[in-house]
Amino acid sequence: MAGVLGKRRTVHGERVPATGSALLVMNHVSHLDPCYDAVFVHSHGRVPHFLAKHSLWNVPVMGAILRGAKQIPVYRGTTDAQQSLRAAHEALANGQVVVIYPEGTITRDPDGWPMASRTGVARLALEHDGPVIPVARWGTREIYDGYHKKFRPLPRKTVETRLGEPVDLSAYREQPETIALLRDVTDLLMGEVKHLLADIRGEQAPEGFHTSANTKRDED
């Protein structure tokens, strides 16, 4: 489906490791993101395991794909949220590739920049030794804008995915885990994603992260 709806372009896809675990930290702008991100990871010889908002499992076609691929739904605000994080820890411990959208939902920033993100990504990143790779993707919202219910497959758009270098978290792993530390690591990772997104868009990234009444910063 991804190839039909839009052309794909990947920059530095070789940074996906051929073997072993990896945590791919990505921005989230459209319900189409998992489709493109799954194709991107598969095209580099790996099987992605998604941590994504559970409501995606109710989206026609998308839900069937996610269920069939045995992906990991995240139930925000319930005891099941911790179970989802545990499943992601197990996937990384077993040498798998996990894709996470730390914003927890499609960004509410009017211009599509990342929102303040949830700290579960920091826990995953700090507790495993595999590479933590920031990844930005842009173009899916131009095809399907979920908040405004706009579907514009034509003319065909280009969806670009750009990978950064693995983030060195060794200094953080030596420190006691605190809420402040988790927040710093989360903002560091999403800052890298934001800068990659700025490169794709050819624009200056805004300072900080978008927040709104619906954006909850503390969690998981």
Roles of regions detected by a PLM:
Residues 1-28:
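Helix-to-loop junction immediately C-terminal to a conserved catalytic motif
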Residues 18-78:
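Catalytic core of membrane glycerolipid acyltransferases/transacylases, capturing the structured
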Residues 201-220:
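Short, highly charged C-terminal tails/helix-capping segments
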Residues 21-23, 97-101, 133:
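Residue-level preference for the first positions of well-ordered beta-strands
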Residues 91-121:
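Catalytic-site beta-strand/loop segments enriched in glycine and acidic/polar residues
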Residues 40, 65, 90, 123-127:
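Hydrophobic/aromatic ligand-binding patch that stacks against planar heteroaromatic rings
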Residues 86-91, 159-195, 199:
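A charged, well-structured terminal subsegment
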Residues 111-179, 212:
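A cross-family acyltransferase "interaction/gating" segment
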